[in-house]
């Protein structure tokens, strides 16, 4: 019965302060939602491939690459068995080929389905515990047979009863002889189809094309094992890279590969996902500060009621029970509201994050943990203030004296500070992304497109001929694609004019093109002359980065290997904006570096869809089923900004939630303060104060809090964003005006929050207020 009494009292109290109750519930719910979603996302990204047996002891073998900051993951097939036989620390080893391949139901099928494919042997099956659902393992030894996972069978045929059926791939028909268990998509190698390998293919050691996974014994020392591998003379290890440097083997934990060696597969950088999680935690802090502020304000507003309860015999436990009942109701409402929000955002969130299945269970667990932590923290505050009120109940003068509570002011200042910090970060991000999207990247990106198509010269000639007849096409060339790069080649250079004796060889990104290529992309010559269309094959043009790497102040006329430098072009970006510009050399056609050429189109950017539709229709009418891809320079560059665009969306959501929580909190707080200070406002009016003067006094108080909060938040935000922007090669000028803009915006926000409540309180009839008091 006592519990029922507490609940009734709690409901009456919460109904009396409706605005504050709703503000507390909504604020906590929004904070819970943002933090829970970010926590689920981080956990999902950090648990890729964790379902394998002994996943904490599994590694992916890597080796150093000729290109800086890159790791080579492909090796010769026999190296896996050699490592297992040579090093007792290796418990299991498996080599496998993995790629996504287009599969058809028959040769005449109009459409193909892209499936993750693995080619390997029984060692892969044993190491990764691949289970046979139906059929036999004969496909591992019979080249004409293949196995599908249950998920792959459903995608192709709509059923798992597929034994004996056939599929078509790469000009061959394969019979399905097995159905296997799959791994789903929560893995770095989501395969749906598996081929076996005959002994002849396994013994081929000429070209490294296979991933190698190792499972080490529990007592193995990873660092010591890597040292032994690199000091041993392994027969199937690539001893030296093509630039002459020694190849160094490394072991990357399989569960870390998602955000290390395979980070380019991420739609959002793991750094940004963790940042989103940190922002979710910041929102929880904001919501809790908002909640605690209103809780303490309500307790002080009810101090007479509480003192009367104590005078009538109520104990501290009883007072605590009243407030804990209110707390339980508010937390229950927040959790229920949060689950409703989750229902609304679950689908778009899963699409953005790539999480499979429902997230309701982990989110619900996260909600309960957050609610429990909030309950325990609030319990402490309630006990403290109940003890304080009980200790003063025999001092009426103290109880009834109006007070200005510093706790609420601190809470408001924290809310303003967090809001200013998030708004500054979002605004800075938007400006930097806009700068990256519109900055000069060293070549023309407007109206340039690349058509990647098969090596059919007749088809290419036909496409070029038809494109030149289109009114929106200015120019069509068959050249190397600069951006996006279709293929790339490295040129190891160990000698050049002015080279120091202790200087290491350098690797240049070699482009076998001349003047036609330079003109098409609008590369800017800053020194010397350009390459002639049919000039000296020993002439070369380099970029600024190559000149700096070779320490050439005036490179014109100097030798690089067998080539003579005739010109220098301005640096141009053909990689992500976080990656420094590569050293580049442009050389004539008859050179050792051989690269494929694609169809380059200069056209009106507004007709992008029209161009794509025309080329697709043309190719399908000439050679149906031929794979063709059209990409504009702008689309390819936007792909590099994909993580930043996603972070922009996440930060926008966080900023909106942050402003909303602060708006609700400030409005609710001002409503309580106006209720608490009604008599003070009335006495001021009786003594001659005007409504405008009272409103001005409130504004001064809140503007002072806002100014102090911004003075603290802006330096913190500046340091954080300075560290973030240093990741980029191209950076915008520091926006000093942004501080004033955010401060003015938040000041208007404060006026909006407090205006109605303060103005209404200031215009009340003093006689009515005195009567009610």
Residue ranges of model-derived segments:
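Membrane-helix entry/capping segments
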Residues: 1-7, 12-16, 20, 52, ...
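Alpha-helical transmembrane segments of integral membrane proteins
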Residues: 1-25, 262-265, 295-306, 310-328, ...
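A generic "structured core" feature
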Residues: 13-15, 308, 319-320, 662-665, ...
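Hydrophobic alpha-helical transmembrane segments of multi-pass inner-membrane transport and secretion
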Residues: 16-43, 268-304, 332, 407-432, ...
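Membrane-proximal extracellular/periplasmic loop immediately following the first transmembrane helix
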Residues: 38-102, 201-202, 208-215, 219, ...
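Mid-to-C-terminal secondary-structure elements
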Residues: 121-134, 146-268, 465, 469-639
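Transmembrane alpha-helical interface segments in multi-pass membrane proteins
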Residues: 305-350, 679-726, 741, 745
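Hydrophobic alpha-helical transmembrane segments of polytopic membrane proteins
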Residues: 363-384, 420, 663, 710-712, ...
């Amino acid at each position: 019965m006592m519990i029922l009494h507490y609940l009734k009292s709690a409901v009456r109290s919460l109904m009396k302060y409706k605005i504050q109750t709703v503000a507390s519930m909504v604020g906590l719910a929004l904070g819970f939602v943002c933090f829970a979603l970010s926590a689920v996302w981080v956990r999902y990204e950090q648990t890729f491939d964790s379902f394998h047996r002994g996943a904490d002891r599994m590694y992916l073998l890597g080796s150093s690459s000729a290109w800086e900051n890159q790791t080579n993951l492909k090796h010769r097939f026999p190296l896996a068995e050699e490592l297992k036989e040579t090093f007792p620390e290796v418990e299991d080893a498996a080599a496998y080929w993995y790629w996504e391949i287009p599969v058809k139901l028959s040769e005449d099928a109009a459409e193909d389905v892209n499936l993750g494919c693995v080619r390997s042997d029984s060692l892969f099956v044993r190491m990764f515990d691949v289970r046979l659902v139906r059929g036999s393992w004969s496909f591992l030894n019979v080249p004409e047979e293949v196995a599908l996972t249950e998920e792959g069978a459903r995608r192709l045929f709509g059923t798992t009863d597929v034994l004996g059926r056939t599929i078509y791939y790469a000009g061959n028909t394969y019979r399905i002889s097995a159905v296997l268990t799959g791994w789903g998509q929560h893995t770095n190698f989501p395969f749906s189809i598996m081929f076996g390998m005959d002994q002849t293919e396994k013994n081929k050691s000429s070209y490294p094309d296979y991933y190698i996974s190792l499972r080490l014994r529990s007592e193995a020392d990873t660092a010591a094992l890597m040292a032994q591998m690199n000091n041993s003379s392994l027969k199937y290890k690539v001893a030296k890279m093509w630039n002459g440097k020694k190849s160094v083997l490394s072991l990357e934990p399989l569960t870390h590969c998602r955000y290390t060696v395979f980070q380019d597969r991420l739609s959002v950088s793991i750094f940004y996902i963790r940042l989103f999680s940190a922002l979710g935690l910041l929102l929880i802090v904001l919501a809790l500060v908002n909640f605690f502020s209103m809780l303490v304000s309500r307790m002080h507003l009810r101090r007479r009621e509480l003192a009367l309860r104590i005078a009538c015999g109520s104990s501290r436990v009883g007072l605590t029970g009243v407030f804990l009942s209110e707390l339980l109701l508010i937390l229950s409402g927040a959790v229920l509201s949060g689950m409703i929000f989750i229902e609304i955002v679950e689908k778009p969130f899963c699409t953005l994050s790539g999480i499979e299945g429902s997230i309701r269970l982990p989110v619900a667990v996260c909600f309960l943990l957050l609610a429990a932590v909030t309950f325990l923290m609030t319990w402490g505050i309630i006990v403290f203030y109940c003890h304080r009120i009980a200790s003063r109940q025999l001092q009426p003068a103290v109880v009834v004296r109006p007070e200005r509570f510093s706790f609420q002011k601190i809470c408001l200042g924290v809310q303003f500070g967090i809001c200013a910090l998030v708004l500054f970060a979002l605004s800075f991000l938007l400006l930097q992304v806009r700068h990256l999207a519109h900055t000069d990247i060293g070549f023309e990106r407007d109206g340039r497109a690349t058509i990647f198509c098969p090596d059919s010269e007749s088809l290419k000639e036909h496409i070029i001929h038809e494109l030149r007849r289109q009114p929106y096409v200015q120019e069509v060339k068959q050249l190397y694609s600069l951006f996006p790069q279709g293929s790339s080649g490295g040129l190891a250079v160990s000698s050049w004019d002015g080279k120091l004796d202790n200087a290491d060889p350098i690797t240049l990104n070699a482009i076998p093109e001349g003047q036609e290529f330079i003109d098409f992309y609008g590369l800017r010559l800053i020194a010397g002359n350009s390459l002639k269309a049919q000039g000296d094959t020993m002439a070369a043009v380099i970029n600024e980065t190559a000149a700096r790497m070779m320490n050439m102040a005036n490179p014109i006329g100097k030798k690089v290997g067998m080539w003579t430098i005739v010109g220098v072009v301005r640096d141009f970006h053909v990689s992500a904006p976080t990656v420094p510009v590569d050293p580049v050399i442009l050389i004539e056609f008859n050179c050792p570096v051989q690269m494929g050429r694609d169809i380059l189109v200069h056209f009106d950017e507004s007709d992008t869809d029209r161009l794509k539709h025309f080329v697709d229709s043309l190719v399908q009418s000439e050679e149906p089923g031929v794979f063709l891809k059209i990409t504009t320079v702008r689309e390819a560059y936007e792909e590099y900004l994909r993580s930043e665009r996603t972070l922009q969306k996440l930060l926008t959501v966080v900023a909106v939630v942050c402003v909303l929580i602060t708006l609700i909190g400030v409005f609710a707080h001002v409503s309580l303060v106006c209720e608490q200070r009604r008599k003070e406002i009335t006495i001021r009016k009786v003594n001659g104060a005007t409504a405008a003067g009272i409103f001005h006094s409130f504004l001064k108080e809140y503007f002072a809090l806002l100014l102090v909060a911004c003075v603290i938040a802006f330096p913190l935000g500046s340091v954080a964003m300075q560290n973030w922007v240093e990741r980029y090669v191209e950076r915008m000028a520091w926006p000093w005006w942004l501080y004033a803009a955010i401060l003015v915006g938040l000041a208007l926000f404060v006026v909006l929050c407090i205006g109605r409540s303060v103005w209404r309180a200031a215009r009340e009839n003093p006689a009515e207020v005195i009567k009610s008091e």
